[in-house]
From Swiss-Prot:
GTP hydrolase that promotes the GTP-dependent binding of aminoacyl-tRNA to the A-site of ribosomes during protein biosynthesis. Its EC number is 3.6.5.3. It is found in: Cytoplasm. It holds the Pfam family GTP_EFTU_D3. This is Elongation factor Tu. GO terms for molecular function: GTP binding; GTPase activity; translation elongation factor activity. Residues 19-26 are annotated as: G1. Residues 174-176 are annotated as: G5. The gene is tuf. Belongs to the TRAFAC class translation factor GTPase superfamily. Classic translation factor GTPase family. EF-Tu/EF-1A subfamily. Residues 136-139 are annotated as: G4. The lineage of its organism: Bacteria, Bacillati, Cyanobacteriota, Cyanophyceae, Synechococcales.
Length: 399
């Protein structure tokens, strides 16, 4: 049987469910697919299908993630749900599932709990742009005042992490009742999806952002000059445009005199293209792997940053022993290893710790020996002699 073609007739958005353990994320995910399946916009999945998600390996880290897809009248969604708390954290830090927005699930019976807060913070740090709240298990709370109090508490919590608490929609739902086919609660799931359609913005396409290409290889063509190759991460670049070479050494300006892809000449290269860019007046030794070519003035190199890091366990190929402040690994950023130092760290909840064990999650301050184009929300790996021992995301640029 021939595979059916993916129809691109609606905008595609990646979302996920986040929130405290046992607040009903997986049940709600199942309910969404069941309610939309009745309109022919999804394949109905039950709790077991989603909860029994197979393990995935992303950069050598084992993550349990369930992927479901469904449509609303407006959009096509890919939705991730992770059964375990540790899986969420790994997922968000490694970028295994990039989210354009998330449904924060909070049980009306409990109100916000520890992981509710932690997931909101993580969403902020890894750059999830928008949230919608599903206040779940509302069928179990008779008192309207309790629900109002929980809503206020959630809004204050969102505000404290710089999300617009007053504007984020909070929809009262019961994933379980909707799954059982109760029509009142089914309509609440539809209301939730209408809020998701309206409040989670369509992602800005990479092509509309300022040009950036990480240099993977450099060679010189006799009589023509120096060519840098790589995959364009975002934006587009035209022949004749000025670009900056950023990172490792002082930033310098050059002009793109040719764009080639698969040995063919192009007028412009765009996000996703693997290209060779011919650069005017640049010697082969002036540019190396690990530098980036960017739209003039769009990015500055940095050496000091804060990051959220997951340190691999021994079984995941990580270290067998702990490390201490002052540890000097390589940071693999975009296309190259840069030596640096982890000057300070705390546990992920801010508690002071003396050492970092394999399997830990930490907040760290890193300092690189030379400036590189690092940006907030960017992923990096921590390596030692060529093997990955940690995965992280830049939460803040210091200098």
């Amino acid at each position: 049987m021939a595979r059916e073609k993916f129809e691109r007739n609606k905008p595609h958005v990646n979302i996920g469910t986040i929130g405290h353990v046992d607040h009903g994320k997986t049940t709600l995910t199942a309910a969404i697919t069941n309610v939309l399946a009745k309109k022919g916009q999804a394949q109905a999945q039950d709790y077991g299908d989603i909860d029994g998600a197979p393990e995935e390996r992303e950069r050598g880290i084992t993550i349990n993630t369930a992927h479901v897809e469904y449509e609303t009248a407006e959009r096509h969604y890919a939705h991730v749900d992770c059964p375990g708390h540790a899986d969420y954290v790994k997922n968000m830090i490694t970028g295994a599932a990039q989210m354009d927005g998330a449904i924060l699930v909070c049980a009306a019976t409990d109100g916000p709990m520890a992981q509710t807060k932690e997931h909101i913070l993580l969403a902020k740090q890894v750059g999830v742009p928008a949230l919608v709240v599903a206040l779940n298990k509302c069928d179990m709370v008779d008192d309207e005042e309790i629900i109002e109090l929980v809503e206020m508490e959630i809004r204050e919590l969102l505000d404290s992490y710089d999300f617009p608490g007053d504007d984020i929609p909070i929809v009262q739902v019961s994933g379980l009742k909707a799954l059982e086919g109760d029509s009142t609660w089914e309509s609440k799931i539809e209301e939730l999806m209408t809020a998701v359609d309206a409040s989670i913005p369509e992602p800005e396409r990479e092509i509309d952002k300022p040009f950036l290409m990480a240099v993977e290889d450099v060679f010189s063509i006799t009589g023509r000059g120096t060519v840098a190759t790589g995959r364009i991460e975002r934006g587009k670049v035209k022949v004749g445009e000025e670009v900056e070479i950023v990172g490792i050494r002082d930033t310098r300006l050059t002009t793109v005199t040719g764009v080639e892809m698969f040995r063919k000449l192009l007028d412009e290269g765009m996000a996703g293209d693997n290209v060779g860019l011919l650069l005017r007046g640049v010697q082969k030794e002036d540019i190396e792997r690990g530098m980036v070519l960017v739209k003039k003035g769009s990015i500055t190199p940095h050496t000091k940053f804060e990051g959220e890091v997951y340190v691999l366990k021994k079984e995941e190929g990580g270290r067998h022993t702990p490390f201490f402040a002052g540890y000097r690994p390589q940071f693999y950023i975009r296309t190259t290893d840069v030596t640096g130092q982890i000057t300070a760290f705390t546990a992920d909840d801010g508690a002071n710790v003396e050492m970092v064990m394999p399997g830990d999650r930490i907040k760290m301050t890193g300092e690189l020996i030379c400036p590189v184009a690092i940006e907030q929300g960017m992923r990096f790996a921590i390596r030692e002699g060529g093997r990955t021992i940690g995965a992280g995301v830049v939460s803040k640029i210091i200098e």
